[in-house]
């Protein structure tokens, strides 16, 4: 977040349990200087799950990305929001991760010819992590919202 907070050429979007370590990511943290408004933090309450995340992605991320028109989309995928992960207290499932990936893939398809990079960030229940990564990588899941 802080790497790009003053950069209007990067749209940074984050959903995360709040309050939680490291204590950043308040909704009021929205960038600085020329980058103000290009950082979007959506704090989530403990226990929120698939429907809550889908709603935030559809109501907040999609309109922001459509206005921004990215040339490349990068996902830093934190799987510690999985309902079985010991680090956080969120309620995402494998299907939820697949749906969120499809939403983001749709943004990449509309604005940057599908240029999408995804990296693994977190996830500490290895069974849930493996299942979530495998589920979101299935082509039918990505095609679902790209069409």
Predicted regions and their residues:
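A general "terminal functional-core" signal
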Residues: 1-147
């Amino acid at each position: 977040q802080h790497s790009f907070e003053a950069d209007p050429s990067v749209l940074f979007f984050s959903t995360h349990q709040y309050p939680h370590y490291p204590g950043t990511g308040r909704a009021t943290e929205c960038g600085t200087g020329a980058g103000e408004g290009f950082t979007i933090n959506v704090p989530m309450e403990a226990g929120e799950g698939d429907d809550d995340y889908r709603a935030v992605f559809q109501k907040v991320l999609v309109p922001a990305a459509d206005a921004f028109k990215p040339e490349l989309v990068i996902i830093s995928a934190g799987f510690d929001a999985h309902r079985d992960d010991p680090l956080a207290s969120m309620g995402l499932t494998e299907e939820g991760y697949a749906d969120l990936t499809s939403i983001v893939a749709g943004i990449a398809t509309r604005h940057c010819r599908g240029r999408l990079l995804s990296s693994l960030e977190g996830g500490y229940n290895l069974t849930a992590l493996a299942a979530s990564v495998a589920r979101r990588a299935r082509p039918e899941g990505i095609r679902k919202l790209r069409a």
